[in-house]
Amino acid sequence: NKPVQYITGETYFYNDKFLTPPGVFIPRPETELLVDCAVEFLSKSKDNLRIIDFCTGSGCILLSIAKKFPNHEYIGIDKSEIAIKTAKKNRKLLGLKNVQFFNQDIFKYNQSKGDLLMCNPPYLSNHEIENLEQSVKENDPLSALTDFKNGTSFYKHLISNFNKLVKKNGIMLLEIPFS
């Protein structure tokens, strides 16, 4: 029942290969829409913007954008050490220099604001976790899937702290569940 991405240690996202060892969330194809939205915003923007990606995981979202728009500053934040180590390896594989990754809890983040803040947070409720496919529960890191509550704590934090996290005229892009 192990996903092929954990067997091979890699997956494709937005036309690039990314390392995805066990313990790091496997990016889903629908998350590429978040990249598309960021690309649309950045294609109409000036250079030298700061793009921040909370819950960065393997770094695939941030790195996919940085590859298309190299004239910006990119910061990826994740509380998982293995995710940050993997994101740094993925950065090296793609040959990108303008991307930094930090091991930090987003609830304690108080550094610089972003012109673009992105996040694909853990959004499943405890009830939804109970009903997930067994292979997902056994293989994906649960902390990347759920806040171990009702699935809204990350959204509440990001929205209530918008002015502390996002610069004036900046935007926030969030992946939200279908439900």
Task: Give residue spans per PLM region.
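Conserved SAM/SAH cofactor-binding pocket of Class I
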Residues: 33-131
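Conserved Class I SAM-dependent methyltransferase catalytic core
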Residues: 149-179
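Active-site beta-alpha loop architecture of Rossmann-like, nucleotide-cofactor-dependent enzymes
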Residues: 5, 124-127, 179
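Mobile active-site "lid"/loop adjacent to the S-adenosyl-L-methionine
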Residues: 123-154
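Conserved AdoMet
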Residues: 1-41
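Class I S-adenosylmethionine-dependent transferase superfamily signal
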Residues: 38, 65, 136, 158-162
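Residue-level signal for inorganic ion chemistry
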Residues: 1, 31, 61, 87, ...
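Short loop/edge segments at beta-strand edges and connector loops
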Residues: 8, 102-104, 176
